[in-house]
């Protein structure tokens, strides 16, 4: 415990009410967040002579300050605790790591919000629902939502430039907010709120609201509106009945856990309508001395209760470990969902088999992760010996990708002692250079990456430059010109030149842009690590380049079709609601566009399928 922290005086001020506490170290950093039914009793337990674990002893030694937030109920405390954990990422808490590759459904915060598939960082304003186990699950959900609640799914660029409604409006899959007068803002906002409630699992609230509106319309003799609302109610009821009836059509999340060598894997099976929709393995950060019960309990809380995104909630949650706060967690999740969601730990029959499957997958994924980390660590030790550089903590690698100078993209990948840090991978769109000038591209990406202040833990020990002596020389020139507060001599710059015929194992490494390089034996573990990092950077750059190139080319794909000029291209995109709906459209649907004959529609259809 910090000498500056007076525990006796502090405990005299603490209430016996429920609440959340935040512990700070001498640097004013939050190191632990906890919740308690009785704050005074819980906090007093940290300052006894005999503590429960070494982890707690290490935590208490660093306490310099404790802040307390009182809540009305223990459920409120639980929700607040997980929001604080999400915000502060304390090092003594079990942390569920975000994986930005998981697909989500995004509901924008525009005047007329749109629904879309989303991956990556959540920068745009709006609501995020998920994550979903795969992209197909998202697309199926979006298709269902479009039938139930007709709000737009078109790109903003299409929405802003329409003068007449698209095909989606004509088949009653969109209310047509793009054209003034087709729908008032109040009705559109109601449909958006229904989507928000539906994706949050609050189906009964949606039905209640629709029934109330139908009855009101009927009393006011607006029978056409009442009939439309009746049809919408029936559609929602059909879906929800399929989701939550017992037997072979249940919605369950099944959570299996494996714990070994200080690392945990939690595997979640997503079962929808009685079928395994998909699954994901999660590897939370686990502080030393943490128990399995604490790992699983914290995971369940963070997974379902953190407020940064709205998770699609099942009808039931199965876990393979009895949790101390199971009832509190179930009550909190149920309150969030607006319906009862039980948490079961001793299922029978098919549920028991699901749980066994989740547990088996958790063990398999954990063993694979441990094996991978062991291999990477062995290779890293060899690399430290080869480079005569001890305690390498962070490595970064850069590569450039383009096609004949078109749409140049640079990539940066990051590795630590455990392997790839994919959440820190970055791509940079290169602009303002002569097409095909790889040296200028490397110059630009390095300045954008490093010409700024960096936290100590973000300074790489090694920077690999894929491209040989020329690119290495460019990198050294950039670092010689940088004027930053951190030590630009700390990163070791290492060039990687591909061997003859670009065969793996024949690479030449360079410390300097002049003179001879050196090679490592093809079976060298150090070389294998370098190849792994280089290949990750190469693949990341190529993927980014192809995505950027496809985006540019897709807009001109129509103009390459004989008979399609700029005017017809614009007409097609406006009428269909964008490029993707046009790609998905049938020949008959394309032929409905004014000025497009059946023969031309067939030509467009097959050209876009190539």
From Swiss-Prot:
The keyword DNA damage applies. Interacts with UvrB in an incision complex. One of its GO terms (cellular component) is cytoplasm. The keyword DNA damage applies. GO terms for molecular function: DNA binding; excinuclease ABC activity. Residues 16-94 form the GIY-YIG domain. It is found in: Cytoplasm. The gene is uvrC. Belongs to the UvrC family. NCBIfam families: PRK00558.1-5, uvrC. InterPro entries: GIY-YIG_endonuc, GIY-YIG_endonuc_sf, GIY-YIG_UvrC_Cho, Hlx-hairpin-Hlx_DNA-bd_motif, RuvA_2-like, UVR_dom, UVR_dom_sf, UvrABC_protein_C. Keywords: Cytoplasm, DNA damage, DNA excision, DNA repair, Excision nuclease, SOS response. This is UvrABC system protein C. Residues 204-239 form the UVR domain. It holds the Pfam family UvrC_RNaseH_dom. Its main location: cytoplasm. GO terms for biological process: nucleotide-excision repair; SOS response. The UvrABC repair system catalyzes the recognition and processing of DNA lesions. UvrC both incises the 5' and 3' sides of the lesion. The N-terminal half is responsible for the 3' incision and the C-terminal half is responsible for the 5' incision.
